[in-house]
Amino acid sequence: MIEKYIQLSDRIFFIDFGIHVDDGSISTIFNPNDNYNIIVFPTVTEGINWEMFKDKISANSTEPTNQMGLSFDTSVGSKIVDDYYTVKCTNARSWVMMCKPTLKNVKCRRSGNVQIHPKSITMFEKFKERGVKIVAYTAANITITYAHECIGNIINSVGIKAN
């Protein structure tokens, strides 16, 4: 689907299910941008890494306590400018692509075809291999809603008895 719209659009803004992007991050999508091809908005992965939390507390980390045990879907490298960092690898659930400059890098020179891998992490790896400039906007305030099954619904399912 991205192959179709990358050739027809100026920008593609992808938001996965359950993701909410704040207004400040939305404004970065519409700002003129000649320096980066793709901007990813790093999000927290589900769960808390209690070992990492314990290690950071023991090491007197200056990181904010509310994010010490969290893992993110994007690994960042060096700082470019305020709130923008290079991306080492990502499995981003929210991102914006500037189509024209990205298309120049991903279009096959011989056939003119565009092939984009359907898996997010592989897609971004292939983009980096082809010279697409991917950056992370770390000031993004992303809210994620995780869907889960209520234990009451599981207990009341057919064939399950609760004593």
Task: List where the protein language model places each region.
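A short, glycine-/small-residue-rich helix N-cap motif at loop->alpha-helix starts
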Residues: 1, 21-22
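Conserved catalytic core of nucleotide-sugar-dependent glycosyltransferases
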Residues: 22-112
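C-terminal catalytic/acceptor-binding lobe
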Residues: 86-163
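Short amphipathic alpha-helical segments and helix-helix/interface helices
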Residues: 2-3, 26-30, 120-125
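Short, Asp-centered acidic motifs that coordinate Mg2+ and/or phosphate
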Residues: 11, 37-38, 134
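Short beta-strand-to-loop acidic/aromatic patch adjacent to the donor-nucleotide binding site
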Residues: 8-20
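Short beta-alpha junction loops
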Residues: 19, 44-47, 139-142
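Active-site nucleotide-sugar/metal-binding loop of Leloir-type enzymes
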Residues: 1-11, 31-34
